[in-house]
């Protein structure tokens, strides 16, 4: 019997991947986590039924969200990653020897442990001695931070469920205060391809632009993300 995993992009569109077997499944305090093995994408992990990343294309996401701001900012020393429990963003940041401190704030400890077990190439980023992992809510974590970071990367999954607070006006305002004068914030902006998702992207843009005077969008093709067309938002003071 064939086993397929389907990620529903809308109620009329889905992406299905033939899987060899399921490697893990558990409901945590924050989300439903499943790990599958497939021939086409290798191992992939899902959260509440939606693919988070796969071994085959995770590099596109992690490289785009890290190396673009690093290419622009000449003096990044202190970095905050909101989410990022898989370690992929920390891995890409670890290539920059000038970075002194990488704080990763991830609410779900189970997610981190699952990624360490099944996605070691990502999770090795968390082993860098400059990385500090805080198991906390990103919104609350930021409330006490002022003028501390050169770069903030919001690696949260999407503006739903336990990550909804990371796409609010309060969150963007807290990020603005936590950044130094020449600081940069980057976050995954989702896909505007489907009508409902386009509305979500516009709403996120309005909230972020309320705090940051400089805002730009860049894009990448990531096959396992909804529609494959993925945006990233670049914000600066």
Pin down the residues of each PLM region.
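N-terminal auxiliary segments of SAM/dcSAM-dependent transferases
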Residues: 1-44
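The AdoMet/dcAdoMet-binding core of the Class I SAM-like
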Residues: 2, 53-187, 194-201
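Ordered hydrophobic segments in well-structured contexts
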Residues: 6, 44, 184, 232-234
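Substrate-binding/catalytic lobe of Class I Rossmann-like enzymes that use SAM or dcSAM, i.e.
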Residues: 190-237
């Amino acid at each position: 019997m064939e086993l397929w995993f389907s990620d529903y992009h809308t109620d009329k569109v889905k992406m299905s991947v033939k899987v060899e077997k399921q490697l893990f499944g558990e409901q945590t305090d924050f989300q439903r986590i499943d790990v599958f093995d497939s021939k086409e994408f290798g191992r992939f992990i899902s959260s509440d039924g939606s693919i988070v990343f796969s071994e085959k294309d995770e590099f596109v996401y992690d490289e785009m969200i890290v190396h673009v701001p690093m290419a622009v900012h000449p003096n990044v020393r202190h970095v905050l990653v909101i989410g990022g429990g898989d370690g992929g963003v920390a891995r890409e940041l670890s290539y920059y020897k000038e970075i002194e401190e990488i704080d990763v704030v991830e609410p779900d400890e189970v997610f981190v442990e699952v990624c360490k077990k099944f996605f070691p190439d990502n999770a090795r980023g968390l082993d860098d001695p400059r990385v500090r992992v805080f198991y906390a809510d990103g919104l609350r974590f930021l409330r006490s931070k002022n003028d501390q970071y050169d770069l903030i990367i919001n690696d949260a999954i999407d503006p739903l469920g336990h990550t909804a607070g990371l796409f609010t006006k309060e969150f963007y305002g807290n990020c603005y205060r936590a950044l130094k004068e020449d600081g940069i914030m980057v976050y995954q902006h989702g896909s505007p391809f489907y009508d409902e998702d386009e509305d979500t992207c516009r709403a996120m843009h309005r909230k972020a632009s309320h705090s940051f005077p400089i805002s730009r969008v860049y894009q990448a093709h990531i096959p396992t993300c909804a529609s494959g067309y993925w945006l990233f938002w670049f914000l600066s003071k």
